[in-house]
């Protein structure tokens, strides 16, 4: 059980990016009114992919709404929640997630191990904000 969103975010990030999969990343990225918790620039199947992540311990509705808004500016948008919320997502929100298409769900165990329980569709046409361009152009 995570006591804070910060702890959830740190554990997830430590395990998600252990191999350096994110070429660029920014926490609290201003891609919309209010920030996305994390934005990454990655190469996946030989294509550039921009991801946004929202971390929540509770208030799943808010997380989904934020991720839905983020999805306009990225290829894939994710909510990242503790693993004990998995059944809640599958029982209560799965049909809504299918409807909005571009939002996926990742659950994280206390150890940091994570799994995708709902896969979003890749959005090809996105509104690229200036801060995402700046992030992409930063030197490694």
Show where each model-derived region lies.
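A generic structural motif
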Residues: 41-43, 108
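Acidic-basic catalytic patches of nuclease active cores, encompassing PD-(D/E)XK
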Residues: 1-34, 44-46
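Short loop or secondary-structure boundary microenvironments that flank
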Residues: 2, 29, 56-57, 83
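Conserved catalytic cores of phosphodiester-cleaving nucleases, focusing on short active-site segments
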Residues: 12, 38-40, 49-59
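Catalytic cores of nucleic-acid endonucleases
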Residues: 57-108
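A generic structural signal for short beta-strands and their flanking turns/coil linkers
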Residues: 34, 49-51, 75
